[in-house]
From Swiss-Prot:
Name of the protein in its database record: Pyruvate kinase
GO molecular function: ATP binding; kinase activity; magnesium ion binding; potassium ion binding; pyruvate kinase activity
Pfam families listed in its UniProt record: PK (PF00224), PK_C (PF02887)
Origin superkingdom: Eukaryota
PANTHER family in alphabetical order: PYRUVATE KINASE
Species classification: Eukaryota, Fungi, Dikarya, Basidiomycota, Agaricomycotina
InterPro entries, sorted: Pyr_Knase, Pyrv/PenolPyrv_kinase-like_dom, Pyrv_kinase-like_dom_sf, Pyrv_Knase-like_insert_dom_sf, Pyrv_Knase_AS, Pyrv_Knase_brl, Pyrv_Knase_C, Pyrv_Knase_C_sf
Signal sequence extent: none
SUBUNIT field: Homotetramer.
Protein residues bound to Mg(2+): E256, D280
Binding-site residues for K(+), renumbered to this chain: N65, S67, D99, T100
Pathway named in the protein's UniProt entry: Carbohydrate degradation; glycolysis; pyruvate from D-glyceraldehyde 3-phosphate: step 5/5
EC supergroup of this enzyme: transferase
Cofactor: Mg(2+); K(+)
Length: 532
């Protein structure tokens, strides 16, 4: 791999970093960011105008949180997002993600809706007996997981309300668990329950989740963020529910419990991508260990070339404040340095007072973090862990990234049908943009999951005769260059590496071309395919 200014180590590269020379996003550079931004859409920004604002600030994927809201509300998010996309002059795609509620465990309803204080040392009963489901107090607390008594044991812990209350199990008698409070707190209605170091046997989808997935299929969502995944079989069950009509929807698994971390390898084999969901994960395992789990999962995703998202509390203070804490900015930057493909905003955009500012801050931080990466040793590391021999498409992707470095090319341009070639090029983390052109509109949206990819949907019909093939290829290249120029991703006269197939369809990528971006706009006009 050709060195960056003669530097071939990350530590040496770090010595050259200069805050005075750090790039600041402007109208001409804001699209240079490689890391995608996911924003959760709440009522505050669920209008075409406000969605346009956050998109212009840097959002690539919108997230619908199905733990809240009705189908009618989420339909409005989909409709407003699609209208916003239509209004964009460059037609740049924005993906839509459905985040499932998942198989949560919760306490019951308190008696008369009251809150009940408890003190450290208090002892009471946690029960799965449904007759207590709506009369909970500080003597008997119902939990809606029927198998609780059979999967846990004395000496284990139960966490209530995001870990605010810790309960130690003293003994078990049928459906009743005798527990002791380890700290002061307040018992309220319908609070979340976590069971650390316990193998929970809940199904991956509730009936509500299945209904939500059917809603997503009808509306053509691009990806599912599947909550509380614990084992590889969970992913297979979700695929069965999606069925043929939802086969093209990407399944991004959320790892947010100890089981998911322990079974990560088998889950990764089944999933299309991973979200490091640090909220619940930081309850189930010690908070001090979350960063280790994050680094492990990101590394394993990078090695196999599957997208990975880092989420939860990234700029949490910007929900209410116009500026983030320094620690939050470092958290976003370190997620990028770790190798994440996407970073996510939750309450910051869903209910926050500063949604646009939150996106702008995340976009600027990602852009700066990307400049702190020394790409040659990163490429070498990724090559070193890749088993040989490689498949043809991956061999071409490796060669394209290496050729771009040797040529000092300013972009790679990938023609892709399914997005697989773009994924493979992204896997080797080139320092330059990956302009991706595809005829599949959903593929164009899904490609945002992969770092460095700038997707464009090519709407023109395919040339079906052999003599039309090269003209069709050249037209798609011109289309990609024209759109990339419009967004200042590349400049006229720049050298680029084009990656294409030798014929149409899937699985035929085997060709590299070294091209120069035309300086005359007329050279980017699409050519007629001729008579069929």
């Amino acid at each position: 791999m050709y060195p960056v200014d003669g530097i071939r180590s990350q530590i040496e590269w770090n010595t050259t970093l200069n805050v005075s020379d750090a790039p600041v996003p402007t109208e001409t550079t804001k699209y240079h960011r490689k890391t995608a931004i996911i924003a959760t859409i709440g009522p505050k920004i669920n209008t075409v105008e406000k969605l346009t604002d956050v998109r212009l600030a840097g959002v690539n994927i919108v997230r619908m949180n199905f733990s809240h809201g009705t189908h009618e509300y989420h339909q409005s998010v989909i409709d407003n997002t699609r209208q916003m996309i239509k209004n964009d002059p460059h037609g740049r795609p924005v993906a839509i993600a459905l985040d499932t509620k998942g198989p949560e465990i919760r306490t019951g309803q308190t008696r008369d809706g009251n809150d009940y204080p408890i003190k450290a040392g208090d002892e009471f009963i946690v029960t799965t007996d449904p007759k207590y489901s709506d009369i909970c107090d500080n003597k008997v607390l119902f939990v809606d997981y029927a198998n609780l008594a059979s999967v846990t044991a004395p000496g284990k812990l139960i966490y209530i309300d995001d870990g605010i209350i810790s309960l130690l199990i003293l003994s078990i008698d049928g459906m009743n668990l005798h527990v002791r409070a380890l700290n002061n707190g307040t018992l309220s209605s319908r609070k979340g329950v976590n069971l650390p170091k316990t193998d929970v046997d809940l199904p991956p989808l509730s009936e509500k989740d299945k209904d939500d997935l059917r809603f997503g299929i009808r509306n053509g969502v691009d990806m599912i963020f599947a909550s509380f995944i614990r084992r590889g079989e969970d992913v297979r069950q979700i695929r069965e529910v999606l069925g043929p009509d939802g086969a093209s929807i990407k399944i991004i698994v959320k790892i947010e419990n100890e089981q998911g971390v322990a079974n990560f390898d088998e889950i990764l084999k089944e999933a299309d991508g991973v979200m490091v969901a640090r909220g619940d994960l930081g309850i189930e395992i010690p908070a001090s260990q979350v960063f280790l789990a994050q680094k492990m999962m990101i590394a394993k995703c990078n090695i196999v070339g599957k997208p990975v998202i880092v989420a939860t509390q990234m700029l949490e203070s910007m929900t209410y404040n116009p500026r983030p804490t320094r620690a939050e900015v470092s958290d976003v930057a370190n997620a990028v340095l770790d190798g994440s493909d996407c970073v996510m905003l939750s309450g910051e955009t869903a209910k926050g007072s500063y949604p646009v500012q939150s996106v702008l801050m995340m976009a600027e931080t990602c852009l700066l973090a990307e400049t702190a990466i020394c790409y040659p040793p990163l490429y070498d590391d990724l090559r070193a862990v890749q088993a040989r021999p490689t498949e043809t498409a991956e061999t071409v992707a490796i060669a394209a990234v290496a050729a771009a470095a040797e040529q000092d090319a300013k972009a790679l341009l990938v023609l892709s049908t399914s997005g697989e070639t773009a994924r493979l090029v992204s896997k080797y983390r080139p320092k330059i943009p990956i302009i991706t052109v595809t005829r599949n509109e959903q593929t164009a949206r899904q490609i945002h999951l992969h770092r460095g990819c700038y997707p464009f949907w090519y709407p023109e019909p395919r040339g079906v005769q052999n003599h039309q093939w090269q003209t069709d290829v050249d037209n798609r290249i011109r289309f990609g260059l024209r759109n990339a120029l419009a967004l200042n991703v590349i400049q006229p006269g720049a050298s680029i590496i084009a990656v294409q197939g030798w014929k149409g369809g899937l699985g035929h990528t085997n060709t590299l071309r070294i091209l120069t971006v035309p300086t005359d706009p007329a050279d980017l006009e699409l050519q007629p395919l001729g008579s069929l």
